[in-house]
From Swiss-Prot:
GO terms for biological process: translation. It comes from Shewanella sediminis (strain HAW-EB3). Binds together with bS18 to 16S ribosomal RNA. Keywords: Ribonucleoprotein, Ribosomal protein, RNA-binding, rRNA-binding. GO terms for molecular function: small ribosomal subunit rRNA binding; structural constituent of ribosome. Residues 104-139 have a biased composition (Basic and acidic residues). The keyword rRNA-binding applies. Belongs to the bacterial ribosomal protein bS6 family. GO terms for cellular component: cytosolic small ribosomal subunit. InterPro entries: Ribosomal_bS6, Ribosomal_bS6_sf, Ribosomal_S6_plastid/chlpt, Transl_elong_EF1B/ribsomal_bS6. Coiled coil: none annotated. Residues 97-139 are annotated as: Disordered. This is Small ribosomal subunit protein bS6.
């Protein structure tokens, strides 16, 4: 079995269908004895150039170990699904399991946002404590 990196773009109007599509496509690979090493749903992102007058698409990345026949079957499924705008299958030398740069950037943004939220809530808690001490002093 060989290792592959697969990226496919889904029509933005079909974003709700992506989890089902991922399940169907991973099922094709695992039924043939393949294994999914990494699966990342990057969500709806801006396209570099318009495809069929669309400026956004839903991106999905998969790193798999599978037979050539099952990957060929997957490519056929992509071709006959109108919701899949583009797909790319690349053969890799080894299994890639670490997070992609896209996922790392998203994790950093999420952690930054959560730390900013904590900083914003901390002053509010401090002012509540000041109010409580002021009320006690007034009594």
């Amino acid at each position: 079995m060989r290792h592959y990196e697969i990226v496919f773009l889904v029509h933005p109007d079909q974003s709700e269908q992506v989890p089902g599509m991922i399940e169907r496509y991973t099922g094709i690979l695992t039924q043939a004895g393949g294994q999914v090493h990494r699966l990342e749903d990057w969500g709806r992102r801006q396209l570099a150039y318009p495809i069929i007058e669309l400026h956004k698409a839903h991106y999905v990345l998969m790193n798999v170990e599978a037979s050539a026949e099952s990957v060929e079957e997957l490519e056929t499924a992509f071709r006959f699904n109108d919701a899949v705008l583009r797909s790319m299958v690349m053969r890799t030398k080894a299994a890639i399991t670490e997070a992609s740069p896209m996922a790392k950037a998203k994790d950093e943004r999420d952690s930054r946002r959560s730390s900013e939220g904590e900083r914003r809530s901390a002053p509010a808690e401090a002012t509540e404590e000041v109010k409580e001490t002021a009320e006690k002093a007034a009594e």
